[in-house]
Amino acid sequence: MFGSGKQLGMKFSYTYQRKQIGIPDAMRIGKRFIGKDSFALALADNLFIGKEMEKYLSKVQNSRLPANILSVKTKFPEKSAVIEVDIKGRIQSIVEKPSKPNSNDTIPGLYFYDKRSVEISKKLKKSKRGELEIVDVHLDYHKNKELSVIPLSQNIKWFDTGDSHEMLIASNYVMEYQKKNKTLTGSIELVAYQRKWISKLKFRDLINKLPESNYKKTLKKFT
């Protein structure tokens, strides 16, 4: 869909997972891409919406610890990894999809690690679910006091769109959010232009190549 990303002022590379054995396998597969760098691991079915999101990403960048995760309060924490913290924000426990959660704080699918995560992922063994668990990566950092958690405010809306019901809820929310704020959410062309990764001329060229749609009409308003 996006090719090399050159047309957006970005650079993309691709690989694929031969077997679905869990999220930590991404570090194994992407070890050459990661190299000696720190990186973000984002799950494609997770959606974050809110003007303050950039502020929280800045907190991650300024963190002194090599591993950072986010937390959000949810009504059904048992559907995700649950994190428990004390009154000072120190991590007490992390459990993957517990039947009886001891907290309403869950860990959304956006993680930040240093290169050591590659070696951690190589040592992991499959859980009872038959998968490598991303929670075990968190716990490895945590036992070495190298993991921080950054709670997101209620102004940030998070959706796990892993099923059709949640996808519908998220889609309706995005529609109303865009109407209210007169903007586009998740428009890669608009982001590239606003970040000045591409010129106005290139932005217009990208828009002109799009098929006729409301999305195209809305993008034109930003030129």
Report each predicted region and the residues it spans.
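Catalytic-core segments of class I nucleotidyltransferases/pyrophosphorylases
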Residues: 40, 54, 58-62, 87-197, ...
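Short, amphipathic C-terminal "tail helix"
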Residues: 197-223
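Conserved beta-loop-beta/alpha segment of the NTase-like Rossmann-fold superfamily
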Residues: 2-87, 112-115, 119-124
